[in-house]
Amino acid sequence: MMPVPLALTIATRTLLLCALAMPACAQEGGKGEDGVPAASQGALHGDLSSELAQGGQHSVRGALAYDRDGMSLDASMDELRNGNYRDGSVFHQRGFNGGAEWKLRQGRFGFTVDELKQDTRYPAPEAPYLAMLAARPEDLYRYEVRRASAFVQRYVGSFELGVELSQREKRADALYAGEEGSAESSYRSRWRQLSPRVRHYGKLGGVGTDTEVGLDLTQWERRSGRAALGRDGNAQRRQNARALLLREELAFGGVVAPRLLLGLRHEQIQLDPADMPADGGNWENQNAWDVQGSLQLRPQLSVYAKAARSYHIDDDGYTSAGYRPLTGQERRETELGATYGDAVRSASVRVFSERLSNQIVFDQSLGQLGFVGNLEPSRRDGIAVEASVALARDWRLDGQVRQVHARYDEYAYDGPDIALVPKTLASVRLYWAGPRGASADLGVQWLRALRYGPDFDNSCLAQVPAFATVDGRYVRKLGAWELELAGSNLANRRHYGDAPGCRSSIYQNDKRQLRVSARYHF
């Protein structure tokens, strides 16, 4: 298999060669069956929107799109400010995304770009040493992410040939104030991936086939550092990966219309020399697979089943072991489900089971900043029921209930429920579609009591109390305008669902939030 850095170096040339292999004139692919261009006139459309909410929150967004003769262009920008309920805190977010696509008779090609910037500022917590200062210091955090991708797709008979090149850059800087002084941390990462694909549609003895084979060649690097009194350090890591994937979907047709999907993925991850195990090689192997099947037993009744194994590799971002990567996470899941009904009334039920090994989580209880770590083996078994019924022409009622038993498995703490995982979630929502562009919905969500974290040994007798919240929304359309009034936690119910300690480190979420917005379409 081709080395990853070399493959990524020639990726741009590959895209250019694929693009040059297509006709340069887009009008051939932009014509309909009668030879008339599909869009002889350019169509420019978009929308502008603004929202105001309690807590000093306000946001604006604008979007534009243009379509003509097989060419599509789109761009959007948004900005959000939020003061939250904490005095002196400020959150500022700006975003942009755009893209272009050209469709031809022989294929299509295009690109996308997006950028997100976030700035957070809030006063440092009260402490005795702060009284000696003329002004309280502030905790500052900045996060930026940039993504870009380009793709080319070519149609050759019943085959689709495609290649995509993607890049993502992340940047994070933080300044924290403490009793021993301030601490600074920084993070820079760059991720590149080249993904060639071959897809084929066909028939085999009356069975429809959809086959896809592909490669993912990935290169990732990260630089991080910390600066504090007497504790300075920097770290740099690189990681290359190559993956082979295969997907096959079979459609048998007939009365019950059986469908079967098979997916396989094998990935090799090349570790940084500093992360190699003492008695191992520099490559780590991971495998994933997916099997799904469905039957249409009756016009209104369908059943399905699926089983899968997946994995997740730590990005070596922020661990307590000196920036050393964690053990890869493994997930095994099975699910059975059935759906019955039509547009008037419907119901579905699914039974699921999930087993996790070396689950990668962010533990807020480790130090002031928290660290990423692996959990012991665990499992989650449950059932979910959803139903929908049209009460009248303009009224609809939806409801769902989810029951989950989450516990540690094959572990010294085998038996206790996993902290901060609710056993029962239930919700009911009523929808109304009125005349002259008016609509509304009202919902109630209920969460059953859950255990505090990090109570691994079941020593905390208290539980996070159960709570119910109410939210609603009213929308009115007036020509090109759309006005909306929405609210969450309308009953102003005091509740919280994030408590990393036993009756401590509680993050309240008990404020009624009202929002009003206006959107103009053109």
Task: Briefly describe each language-model feature range.
Residues 2, 26-27, 31, 449-453, ...:
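C-terminal beta-signal and adjacent terminal beta-strands/loops
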Residues 50-54, 68-70, 79-83, 92, ...:
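Transmembrane beta-strands of outer-membrane beta-barrel pores
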Residues 82-83, 87-89, 108-155, 161, ...:
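Flexible loop and strand-edge segments within Gram-negative outer membrane beta-barrel domains
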Residues 160-176, 219-222, 260, 296, ...:
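Membrane-embedded beta-barrel scaffold of Gram-negative outer-membrane proteins
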Residues 204-212, 216-218, 232-356, 390, ...:
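Structural signature of Gram-negative outer-membrane beta-barrels, strongest in the C-terminal barrel
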